[in-house]
């Protein structure tokens, strides 16, 4: 079966990753001891996408957990599903990266990276037909950003024809953990543009807004934010984990979603949104799902899709939904908002469907959009980057680890190019005259 190897790096990556495994294990009926306690054969049919089956009918996540300090790993290990993971797959250092990208990418992380690759290789060799890798990390810190991108480029070298999907938590505009976030994020994006096939952008502020506005939580915790992320991750990977009518895999997703290789940064969303542990009291309808899914308040990255145009969209419906109704609703959204979709990619909205709904819901939908509005997010980081870099503030932390200023300049211009590319395609229109002229030339009578 088409297996995926999951990697989680750094504090953020490990916390999101741990939550993801809780959700997926629950959906597949895997108990905390790795035994199958489910009720439906469908849960086991494609379980090998994420789990290895070991002696005694025990299912073990195909996950590699990486950090440069032992703290977060210890809390994952003592968490509800901690005993599920393979003990050998915990790879950690002792020194920490101290939110310094250079430490994660060049010094501390580089020392640990070979032992991580050994574990990754071992997991990949055990696969029947490896589909690709997914990595959860943040872009604002040291380990997830610096070492995460180092791992991505190393895995890329070794498995050049396998998909690389990243779930990247981007620094948010108002909620900042560290002052050097813009540096770390810019250096990371510089790497992701080249080495990732699809990057799902998530940001804490957007998640915070969803918790506050939509879910009416007065004091959202990181647990609540991570819960939202894990729902989306579960939704994106549904088609891979369950049999459905339209099965997508990471590669099909990329083929449908990435019109130009560098523009692979997606916004994600989910509907219907519910708080952790709450029950759904009313049935949702397909029209409600489609309208909530395209709603700007629903996006998990702080960019407003109304500021740009969609190049491509994918929607994964789950549960007992009528595909006919889905198609009709998706078409009506497109025709009513046609100026928000580029007209030079016809049929740029893809729908897939899986019969099995998530726990506690009758039906749900996961939204993935490749919108030119994502440039807002990069612009914001670039502005903050430039403000500090002009004064060379905090640079000594990076140059002290052997980095060169040149690398900062390169990363900055690569990110500005990315913004310019998004802008260029946002403004691109099909010129009526051009089309007519071409037709005319073809049909011109042969000259005597």
Curated annotation (Swiss-Prot):
<dbReference type="InterPro" id="IPR018316">
    <property type="entry name" value="Tubulin/FtsZ_2-layer-sand-dom"/>
</dbReference>
<dbReference type="InterPro" id="IPR017975">
    <property type="entry name" value="Tubulin_CS"/>
</dbReference>
<feature type="binding site">
    <location>
        <position position="69"/>
    </location>
    <ligand>
        <name>GTP</name>
    </ligand>
</feature>
<dbReference type="Pfam" id="PF00091">
    <property type="entry name" value="Tubulin"/>
</dbReference>
<feature type="binding site">
    <location>
        <position position="226"/>
    </location>
    <ligand>
        <name>GTP</name>
    </ligand>
</feature>
<keyword id="KW-0963">Cytoplasm</keyword>
<dbReference type="InterPro" id="IPR008280">
    <property type="entry name" value="Tub_FtsZ_C"/>
</dbReference>
<feature type="binding site">
    <location>
        <position position="69"/>
    </location>
    <ligand>
        <name>Mg(2+)</name>
    </ligand>
</feature>
<keyword id="KW-0460">Magnesium</keyword>
<dbReference type="GO" id="GO:0046872">
    <property type="term" value="F:metal ion binding"/>
</dbReference>
<protein>
    <recommendedName>
        <fullName>Tubulin beta chain</fullName>
    </recommendedName>
</protein>
<feature type="binding site">
    <location>
        <position position="142"/>
    </location>
    <ligand>
        <name>GTP</name>
    </ligand>
</feature>
<comment type="similarity">
    <text>Belongs to the tubulin family.</text>
</comment>
<keyword id="KW-0493">Microtubule</keyword>
<feature type="binding site">
    <location>
        <position position="204"/>
    </location>
    <ligand>
        <name>GTP</name>
    </ligand>
</feature>
<dbReference type="InterPro" id="IPR037103">
    <property type="entry name" value="Tubulin/FtsZ-like_C"/>
</dbReference>
<dbReference type="InterPro" id="IPR023123">
    <property type="entry name" value="Tubulin_C"/>
</dbReference>
<dbReference type="InterPro" id="IPR013838">
    <property type="entry name" value="Beta-tubulin_BS"/>
</dbReference>
<dbReference type="InterPro" id="IPR003008">
    <property type="entry name" value="Tubulin_FtsZ_GTPase"/>
</dbReference>
<feature type="binding site">
    <location>
        <position position="11"/>
    </location>
    <ligand>
        <name>GTP</name>
    </ligand>
</feature>
<dbReference type="InterPro" id="IPR002453">
    <property type="entry name" value="Beta_tubulin"/>
</dbReference>
<dbReference type="InterPro" id="IPR036525">
    <property type="entry name" value="Tubulin/FtsZ_GTPase_sf"/>
</dbReference>
<dbReference type="GO" id="GO:0005874">
    <property type="term" value="C:microtubule"/>
</dbReference>
<feature type="binding site">
    <location>
        <position position="144"/>
    </location>
    <ligand>
        <name>GTP</name>
    </ligand>
</feature>
<dbReference type="InterPro" id="IPR000217">
    <property type="entry name" value="Tubulin"/>
</dbReference>
<dbReference type="GO" id="GO:0007017">
    <property type="term" value="P:microtubule-based process"/>
</dbReference>
<comment type="function">
    <text>Tubulin is the major constituent of microtubules, a cylinder consisting of laterally associated linear protofilaments composed of alpha- and beta-tubulin heterodimers. Microtubules grow by the addition of GTP-tubulin dimers to the microtubule end, where a stabilizing cap forms. Below the cap, tubulin dimers are in GDP-bound state, owing to GTPase activity of alpha-tubulin.</text>
</comment>
<keyword id="KW-0547">Nucleotide-binding</keyword>
<comment type="subunit">
    <text>Dimer of alpha and beta chains. A typical microtubule is a hollow water-filled tube with an outer diameter of 25 nm and an inner diameter of 15 nM. Alpha-beta heterodimers associate head-to-tail to form protofilaments running lengthwise along the microtubule wall with the beta-tubulin subunit facing the microtubule plus end conferring a structural polarity. Microtubules usually have 13 protofilaments but different protofilament numbers can be found in some organisms and specialized cells.</text>
</comment>
<keyword id="KW-0479">Metal-binding</keyword>
<dbReference type="GO" id="GO:0005737">
    <property type="term" value="C:cytoplasm"/>
</dbReference>
<feature type="binding site">
    <location>
        <position position="138"/>
    </location>
    <ligand>
        <name>GTP</name>
    </ligand>
</feature>
<dbReference type="Pfam" id="PF03953">
    <property type="entry name" value="Tubulin_C"/>
</dbReference>
<keyword id="KW-0206">Cytoskeleton</keyword>
<feature type="binding site">
    <location>
        <position position="143"/>
    </location>
    <ligand>
        <name>GTP</name>
    </ligand>
</feature>
<dbReference type="GO" id="GO:0003924">
    <property type="term" value="F:GTPase activity"/>
</dbReference>
<dbReference type="GO" id="GO:0005525">
    <property type="term" value="F:GTP binding"/>
</dbReference>
<keyword id="KW-0342">GTP-binding</keyword>
<dbReference type="GO" id="GO:0005200">
    <property type="term" value="F:structural constituent of cytoskeleton"/>
</dbReference>
């Amino acid at each position: 079966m088409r297996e995926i190897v999951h990697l989680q790096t750094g504090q953020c990556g490990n916390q999101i990753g741990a939550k993801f495994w809780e959700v997926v294990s629950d959906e597949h009926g895997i108990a905390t001891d790795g035994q199958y306690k489910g009720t439906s054969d469908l849960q086991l049919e494609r379980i090998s996408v994420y789990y290895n089956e070991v002696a005694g009918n025990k299912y073990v996540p195909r996950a590699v957990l990486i950090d440069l300090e032992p703290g977060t790993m210890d809390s994952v290990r003592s968490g509800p599903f901690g005993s599920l993971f393979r003990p050998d797959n915990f790879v950690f250092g002792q020194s920490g990266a101290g939110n310094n990208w250079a430490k994660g990418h060049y010094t501390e992380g580089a020392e640990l990276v070979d032992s991580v690759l050994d574990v990754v290789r071992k997991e990949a060799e055990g696969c029947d037909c490896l589909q690709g890798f997914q990595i959860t990390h943040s872009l604002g810190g040291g380990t997830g950003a610096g070492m995460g991108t180092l791992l991505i480029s190393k895995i890329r070298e070794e498995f050049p024809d396998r998909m690389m999907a990243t779930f990247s938590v981007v620094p948010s505009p108002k909620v900042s953990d560290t002052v050097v976030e813009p540096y770390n994020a810019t250096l990371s994006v510089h790497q992701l543009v080249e080495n990732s096939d699809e990057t799902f952008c998530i940001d804490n502020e957007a998640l915070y807004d969803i918790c506050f506005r939509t879910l009416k939580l007065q004091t959202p915790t990181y647990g609540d934010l991570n819960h939202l992320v894990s729902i989306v991750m579960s939704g994106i990977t549904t088609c891979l984990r369950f049999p459905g009518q339209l099965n997508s895999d990471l590669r099909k997703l990329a083929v449908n979603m990435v019109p130009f290789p560098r523009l692979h940064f997606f916004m994600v969303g989910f509907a219907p949104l519910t708080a952790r542990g709450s029950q759904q009291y009313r049935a949702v309808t397909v029209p409600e799902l489609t309208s909530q899914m395209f709603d700007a308040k629903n996006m998990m990255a702080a960019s407003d899709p109304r500021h740009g145009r969609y190049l491509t969209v994918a929607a994964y419906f789950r549960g007992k939904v009528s595909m006919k109704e889905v198609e009709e609703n998706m078409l009506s959204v497109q025709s009513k908002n046609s100026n928000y979709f580029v007209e030079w990619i016809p049929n740029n909205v893809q729908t897939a469907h899986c019969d099995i709904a998530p726990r506690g819901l009758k039906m749900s939908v996961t939204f993935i959009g490749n919108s030119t509005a994502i440039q807002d997010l990069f612009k914001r980081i670039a502005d903050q980057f430039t403000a500090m870099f002009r004064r060379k503030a905090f640079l000594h932390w990076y140059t002290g680890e052997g980095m060169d200023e040149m690398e900062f300049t390169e990363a900055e211009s690569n990110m500005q190019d990315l913004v310019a590319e998004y802008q260029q395609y946002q403004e691109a229109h099909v010129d009526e005259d051009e089309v007519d002229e071409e037709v005319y030339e073809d049909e011109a009578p042969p000259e005597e």
